[in-house]
């Protein structure tokens, strides 16, 4: 744990939390900070665009016989953030090949548990080993390297940004059964927005925040 710095002076996790009085001010300030971070990304990554993505599945691990069979789960939909363009794109299952092509065209693909999960789901359509071939920054891998254990995206964004997920994978699977792909898209896009903001915060500040029994702690990152 020597790489961790006790956050005695950390601000409360309300960076993105909108109060009635200061919501607009905080939002404008954060947009300005993100714009600065994006300029830095553009300057440093000349070899191709940066994309962030997340996949929601049609079937659960129980449906397909275990997490080791994620390639059978199928794509309900995926959301991609084209970072430098500030644009989001949604891919339904029939566009799985286009999703793969979009990721292949990127200079950097950012995800959360993407190496083990999202890439495996996508490989069910193409047979390709994306964890080996794509330039990837998996933020979960970074946390495991720093902490020696896994930590959820929801925990990281709540502690670092003051904003969390709006649903979870089980709820998404229920929406699949109900045919509510509009709600799945809203949920998945929110996850990608959180991923983007966490990534940009880490680039700009050089750390993210977790909560331990001893208090809130800064975890250095160098992405």
Regions found by a protein language model. Name each.
Residues 1-223:
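DEDD superfamily 3′-5′ metal-dependent exonuclease/proofreading module
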């Amino acid at each position: 744990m020597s790489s961790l710095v006790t956050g005695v002076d950390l601000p409360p996790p309300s960076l993105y939390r909108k109060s009635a009085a200061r919501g607009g001010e905080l939002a404008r300030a954060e947009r300005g900070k993100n714009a600065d971070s994006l300029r830095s990304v553009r300057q440093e990554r000349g070899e191709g665009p940066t994309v962030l993505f997340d996949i929601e599945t049609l079937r659960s691990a129980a449906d397909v016989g275990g997490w080791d069979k994620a390639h059978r789960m199928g794509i309900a939909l995926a959301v991609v953030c084209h970072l430098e363009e500030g644009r989001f794109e949604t891919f339904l299952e029939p566009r799985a090949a286009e999703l793969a092509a979009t990721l292949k065209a990127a200079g950097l693909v950012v995800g959360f548990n993407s190496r083990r999960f999202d890439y495996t789901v996508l490989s069910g359509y193409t047979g390709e080993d994306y964890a080996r071939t794509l330039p990837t920054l998996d933020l979960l891998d970074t946390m495991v390297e720093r902490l020696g254990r896994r930590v959820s995206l929801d925990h990281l964004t709540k502690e670092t940004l003051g904003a969390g997920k709006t649903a979870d994978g089980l709820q998404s699977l229920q929406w699949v059964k109900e045919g509510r792909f509009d709600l799945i898209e809203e949920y998945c896009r929110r996850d990608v927005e959180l991923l983007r903001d966490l990534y940009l915060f880490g680039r700009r500040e050089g750390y993210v925040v977790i909560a331990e029994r001893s208090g809130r702690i800064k975890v250095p990152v160098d992405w």
